[in-house]
Amino acid sequence: MSSKSQLTYSARASKHPNALVKKLFEVAEAKKTNVTVSADVTTTKELLDLADRLGPYIAVIKTHIDILSDFSEETITGLKALAEKHNFLIFEDRKFIDIGNTVQKQYHGGTLRISEWAHIINCSILPGEGIVEALAQTASAEDFPYGSERGLLILAEMTSKGSLATGQYTTSSVDYARKYKKFVMGFVSTRHLGEVQSEVSSPSEEEDFVVFTTGVNLSSKGDKLGQQYQTPESAVGRGADFIIAGRGIYAAPDPVEAAKQYQKEGWDAYLKRVGAQ
């Protein structure tokens, strides 16, 4: 595991060249949480209620905005207001996967207006390097109003059974991240990827990509559709900087208490990793 993973969030924030990553680490340190809650609900009311109730205990809220049956201006303004109120970032799990010209329009514009409210987005690199280049171009354009407040995670690995996001796909994900590091903040992956080397790229001394790991659940090992879970401790131990939990929190009998439990477990695992416990 990279030596950067052994550093505290505050230490990494102090030297990180990416302003959004710096802010993310500062949020985590201030709130003592590395939890991302995956709010897979289907109405604006449910989403905003969940964001308000869980906001104090999370660093990031992850949305699938296209599953909302009533997406509107209220969704955008409400979510942005709650992010400000509770000091968390918004991650739209759009998984962009198309040619560059199309994803630029999907990201900045369109019905969902994703660039307007989502600090973080993600993409698959199945279309090739062009998808990362296109999103990076959009974010660096002179007329893009959000500048360094936006960032991209590359979907380098998945936790579903039989996932094809392995091998050369994962290696190329790291290659593209290194090439477009001003916009790419890290990966959605099951482990730390900083030591990946290829004929195209190799790790640099200052490299510090953030790792988000999905499929974190304290009470289940999987579901009927092939999802494979791991605990906060095992995820952080493999290199996760931020753990993503969905049903384990929002479907719990008491989502607030569940969020607090994930917060504690995730934070304890982080302290153990950096040698502060």
Curated annotation (Swiss-Prot):
Q: Which UniProt keywords apply?
A: Decarboxylase, Lyase, Pyrimidine biosynthesis
Transmembrane intervals:
none
Which EC number applies? 4.1.1.23
Which reactions are catalysed by this chain?
A: orotidine 5'-phosphate + H(+) = UMP + CO2
Which Gene Ontology molecular function entries are recorded, alphabetically? orotate phosphoribosyltransferase activity; orotidine-5'-phosphate decarboxylase activity
Q: In which pathway does it act?
A: Pyrimidine metabolism; UMP biosynthesis via de novo pathway; UMP from orotate: step 2/2
Q: Which Pfam families match?
A: OMPdecase (PF00215)
Q: Active site annotated at which positions? A: K95 (proton donor)
Under the heading Gene3D superfamilies, the entry gives: Aldolase class I
The residues listed in the UniProt record as binding substrate, with positions renumbered to this chain, are 40, 62-64, 93-102, 229, 247
Top EC class of this enzyme: lyase
- Please give the InterPro entries that the UniProt record associates with this protein: Aldolase_TIM, OMPdecase, OMPdecase_AS, OMPdeCOase_dom, RibuloseP-bd_barrel
Which terms in the GO cellular component ontology are assigned?
A: cytosol
- Which example biological process does GO assign this protein? 'de novo' UMP biosynthetic process
- Any signal peptide, and if so, which residues? none
Please state which protein family the record places this protein in.
Belongs to the OMP decarboxylase family.
What is the name of this protein?
Orotidine 5'-phosphate decarboxylase
Gene name, per UniProt, is pyrG
